Amino acid sequence: MRSSQNGGAMGGRAAGTGGGGPSAPVDKEVDYAQYFCTYSFLYHQKDMLSDRVRMDAYFNAVFQNKHHFEGKTVLDVGTGSGILAIWSAQAGARKVYAVEATKMADHARALVKANNLDHIVEVIEGSVEDISLPEKVDVIISEWMGYFLLRESMFDSVISARDRWLKPTGVMYPSHARMWLAPIKSNIADRKRNDFDGAMADWHNFSDEIKSYYGVDMGVLTKPFAEEQEKYYIQTAMWNDLNPQQIIGTPTIVKEMDCLTASVSEIEEVRSNVTSVINMEHTRLCGFGGWFDVQFSGRKEDPAQQEIELTTAPSEQHCTHWGQQVFIMSNPINVEEGDNLNLGLLMSRSKENHRLMEIELNCEIKEASGNPKESFKKTYFIE
């Protein structure tokens, strides 16, 4: 399971360049070095294959809905180790095209052959945007989700595959997705504030020593150093495995997607205005937790026989490698049961790396009576 603050991408597989669009061309070599190369290692695949929540959801979605696979053609976008392609074949697919952008394709091909499915599953190494298939497909299956759903921008590649290769009657696995946000309490906020204060104290000691020993005044760099440290300690979202008891207000949906119709422009910039009500007495608002869920529902004209949901919500029993993204506040605020939080969220892609995210969060807190209490605006980074 993932326990580090950030680190390499963990949610989706390596499928294609995606993400750039005409306004932001993607350098494929840079993109490979920053993103794809991580997925070419078996230890990374093992981490994901060890996530029982993830594995059980996809396994049940496929095998409890065999009618979507039996005798059908399937495209697995970003196959990684090949597990979803193998399951699709075992569920009765006539042909499975398993696309993988990295050398992990060699391992997937070996795994497919070892499971006697190489007459059904064809592993294709390459970007899904660049490959060509001999036919349209009935199903597109992919595990494309990143932190807070959209980090990594891999869904761009799934959209490209869908628009090129999915039949008009085809289904998407998963079919729908949602992003959630909720106010939380956590001692992480205090710990990170202490870390920031410690870094600044160390800087001031360093600055004094440089001036004392070497006669150079470093004071002009204090402000940019503070901004740098604040981004690292306070503004960068953290991976965390939240306990449900840390949620102090109603979780709210900030984005819903139909994977059959969603467009790249729809996810390049996510805007949402929602309200959360504090439901805990005498507590502190220390930040916000963000997570996602996806559904395997088929399509309206061809629904799943058994709907399956994969959720990364805080749980006492089940942790996923995605965890939750925590957006901490440098100065927690005392709140009371019944207080209303009017939230405005804007999530966009980093200008430096389209697979990373920037979030602007506006919050206006009102008492249950409607009287204004406090308001703030924060910027966060999902890296």
Swiss-Prot record:
Keywords: Methyltransferase, S-adenosyl-L-methionine, Transferase. Residues 8-22 have a biased composition (Gly residues). GO terms for biological process: peptidyl-arginine methylation, to asymmetrical-dimethyl arginine; vegetative to reproductive phase transition of meristem. The active site is at E143, E152. Residues 1-23 are annotated as: Disordered. Signal peptide: none annotated. Residues 190-230 are annotated as: Dimerization arm. The keyword Methyltransferase applies. Its EC number is 2.1.1.319. It catalyses: L-arginyl-[protein] + 2 S-adenosyl-L-methionine = N(omega),N(omega)-dimethyl-L-arginyl-[protein] + 2 S-adenosyl-L-homocysteine + 2 H(+). One of its GO terms (molecular function) is protein-arginine omega-N asymmetric methyltransferase activity. S-adenosyl-L-methionine binds at Q45, R54, G78, E100, E129. It holds the Pfam family PRMT_C. Residues 29-360 form the SAM-dependent MTase PRMT-type domain. Ring-like homodimer. Methylates (mono and asymmetric dimethylation) the guanidino nitrogens of arginyl residues in some proteins. Essential for regulating flowering time. Belongs to the class I-like SAM-binding methyltransferase superfamily. Protein arginine N-methyltransferase family. This is Protein arginine N-methyltransferase PRMT10. It comes from Arabidopsis thaliana.
